[in-house]
């Protein structure tokens, strides 16, 4: 039995040696591509190419590694390669170990520089001024609805949406003490609300203390006795806390969608989504006529959100997501028709319609 075990381990060692050699060969090719991109002025990060690579890898996989594991492995490979091509800076709404941070890692891996910032406005500003290459912003949550501040920032910004990230939100009870010793729980109001039923059943007598972020809750709990935090698994890992109960949110469909913002949006992939905004005149049927443009050219409109313009009373901007790329023929025709019925149309970006 021991001989068999040693043989298998030796085989794994041989495969690991081959993997390292192949990874280095792959990286050399990536660096050559980076030189070509740099010479032509192309963006180093290409969401369309990333999507194609991940889809191909998943299609080639025949087990036993599941698709999610293959994506995670190749995400880190691509992250390390990107870091060698150019030390990209990814700005996000901080602090560290929040779900925004987890979204950054899911999309960009852990080899690039992640820059936590205090506000959504700061993320837009850093990318606009070139101090960050890309920004990651929350746009909507399946239980809490739209993140209106992100929508508002697009009104005057020239930045474009170049990718999206869909992240399952999984809240966890963590502490530095046994579960039965926990008397106080720290977190933000939204997390307490999303775990209300679980708390009533499992910790009805615990004192709930609100903090500025779930990360701050984990920081407090690291040193405070008899305290627990409701936060992300990344927070537990970062602050050395034990997860006492995992996935304690009341809804299993708690999902947040994030947008990646940059200076350009990628070319079409054949499976894309377009985000845009427009404004209509104050007349009967104006919005109906505008939306009919999508139906006329058989474009699936997947979301519409309205926001006050803040420039004139009762004037609104409408934000729309639709399937297809703005360079697709039918989408172009629909946008042309839309322009006839609106005061203005602004394309916010076209990007791969994947969960990131």
Model-derived features: where do they sit?
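Domain-level signature for soluble enzymes in the chorismate/prephenate branch of the shikimate pathway
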Residues: 1-356
């Amino acid at each position: 039995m021991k001989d068999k075990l040693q043989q298998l381990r030796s085989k794994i060692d041989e495969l690991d040696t081959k993997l390292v050699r192949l990874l280095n060969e792959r990286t050399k090719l990536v660096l050559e591509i980076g030189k070509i991109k740099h010479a032509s002025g192309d963006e180093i990060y290409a969401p369309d190419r990333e999507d194609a690579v991940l889809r191909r890898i998943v299609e080639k996989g025949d087990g036993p590694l599941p698709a999610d594991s293959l994506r995670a492995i190749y995400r880190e490979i691509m992250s390390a390669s990107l870091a060698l091509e150019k030390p990209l800076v990814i700005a996000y709404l901080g602090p560290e170990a929040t779900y925004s941070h987890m979204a950054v890692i899911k999309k960009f891996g852990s080899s690039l520089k992640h820059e936590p910032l205090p506000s959504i406005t700061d993320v837009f500003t850093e990318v606009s001024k070139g101090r960050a290459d890309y920004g990651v912003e929350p746009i909507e949550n399946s239980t809490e609805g739209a993140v209106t501040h992100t929508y508002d920032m697009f009104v005057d910004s020239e930045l474009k949406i170049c990718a999206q990230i869909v992240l399952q939100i999984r809240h966890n009870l963590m502490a530095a003490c046994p579960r039965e010793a926990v008397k106080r729980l720290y977190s933000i109001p939204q997390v307490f609300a999303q775990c209300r039923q679980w708390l009533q059943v499992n910790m009805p007598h615990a004192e709930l203390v609100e903090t500025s972020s779930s990360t701050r809750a984990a920081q407090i709990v690291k040193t405070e006795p008899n305290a627990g935090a409701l936060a992300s698994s990344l927070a537990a890992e970062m602050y050395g806390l034990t997860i006492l109960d995992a996935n304690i949110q009341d809804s299993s469909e708690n999902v947040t969608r994030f947008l990646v913002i940059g200076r350009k949006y990628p070319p079409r992939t054949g499976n894309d989504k377009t985000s845009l905004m427009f404004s209509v005149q104050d007349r009967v049927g104006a919005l109906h006529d505008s939306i009919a443009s999508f139906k006329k050219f058989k474009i699936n409109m997947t979301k519409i959100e309205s926001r006050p313009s803040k420039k004139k009373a009762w004037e609104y901007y409408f934000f729309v997501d639709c399937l297809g790329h703005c360079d697709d023929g039918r989408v172009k025709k629909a946008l042309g028709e839309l322009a006839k019925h609106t005061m203005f149309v602004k394309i916010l970006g076209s990007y791969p319609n994947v969960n990131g």
